């Protein structure tokens, strides 16, 4: 259930009954401090200003109309007109019970939408590197959350699978195959690309051949398309290994590369010209946008077709947005692309809106993110200053986690150790990223991310096993407590219960804003509240069986919420650590 939404509706009704306009904002928020209750309604001040009333006077009138019977046991006015709401322990107990009876932990489904999520987007014939990590895992956490809430999600892996570099790559692949080393060379994609580029730069005959191959490929020649597909297939097979290691839900079926939109490009250029949006300028086809000014203060020109007839990324992105609305029937489109692409996307979407390709009712959202930095505050690199391959990063995560786990569990079997190292190591890399606000840069630090204290994956995974251990110690099957009532008598029980019931609100924020760090913060807070509850409210040595069973149920809902919350982030859990 969504308590915030329920209270917003109630406060809104009371505001309207007190004379506020029908579109007033109740501004119900979770309280920052326990002494201000569980929720605060902060909308009175703004409404009082509009009505020319003293805020406190309006707050008193709102209170006289506010019916929170069975929901809150105390409502008070604080300061100039804040309304503090304290939830009724009986309401908390009832909803904890309901959450435990539902596989979805009481989370309701909003009206389902078709949502296209564009994420990961590596390039063909290049290995994935750390620069692909953020888009891949933040996008995937968003996808998992939206799917859990019941939306139809279409994953779009906008792979860089087209462009002039393919002439060079096909020419080099052909050369390698003639020397019977094709497969071997492509096992090292990075080396393959580097060698192809070297030949292109140093051998004029090779470069000439490469340029002619581009023309043939773009003309749809079957032989060159076959060679191109080979490059795409080998790259995506290697990428799939990385996706599987990362526990990311992308598959080969989700690839929607740049090449998909090629057939649309001539028609789009012709249509933009016909609509008077695109004009010829110095031989190129350009759209001038009043919304963006150049250094001279004139409308900025966005090229959609070059002098030589070639198309640009902008043209592809216009086609891409059009396709996602017209063919995929998207109600909403999310792009997980780094912040440096912001202006480029905004310009493409401005053209899309002007051309009427996607209506204003369908949001196109750039969920941008910052960079991953080394401890020196500069972009994360190898010691030699090169780009860090994602596969190498995951290998190191596994190795470090293996050492850490072996140290803490010297008697663990080799298989168990390997599995635990994988869960902890990969989880640590992902959680370190997901727990930071995506809009900011963050410092990649092995020691911090593998620590068993603080807001880290190992701490969260351990917190989950710690809650489960209560049931092992009790020797109780969770189903045996189905009929036991939940009774909230202590403050710490109430605080834990209220936070558990804010799970749906947290999911809603992640779904709306694309900010998985909000879920990480919620789960970390929940683990801390459980710790305090466990310390001050004895479970197994409780004074009565009723209290013991009630507290076991709070522990059970905590375990289920931690597991499900981590699952929406793509972080695995184990039952023992």
UniProtKB/Swiss-Prot annotation:
It is found in: Cytoplasm. It holds the Pfam family Arg_tRNA_synt_N. A motif ('HIGH' region) lies at residues 122-132. Its EC number is 6.1.1.19. One of its GO terms (biological process) is arginyl-tRNA aminoacylation. The keyword Transmembrane helix does not apply. It comes from the Bacteria. It catalyses: tRNA(Arg) + L-arginine + ATP = L-arginyl-tRNA(Arg) + AMP + diphosphate. Keywords: Aminoacyl-tRNA synthetase, ATP-binding, Cytoplasm, Ligase, Nucleotide-binding, Protein biosynthesis. GO terms for cellular component: cytoplasm. GO terms for molecular function: arginine-tRNA ligase activity; ATP binding. It is an enzyme of class 6 (ligase). Coiled coil: none annotated. Belongs to the class-I aminoacyl-tRNA synthetase family. Monomer. This is Arginine--tRNA ligase. The lineage of its organism: Bacteria, Pseudomonadati, Pseudomonadota, Gammaproteobacteria, Enterobacterales. The gene is argS.
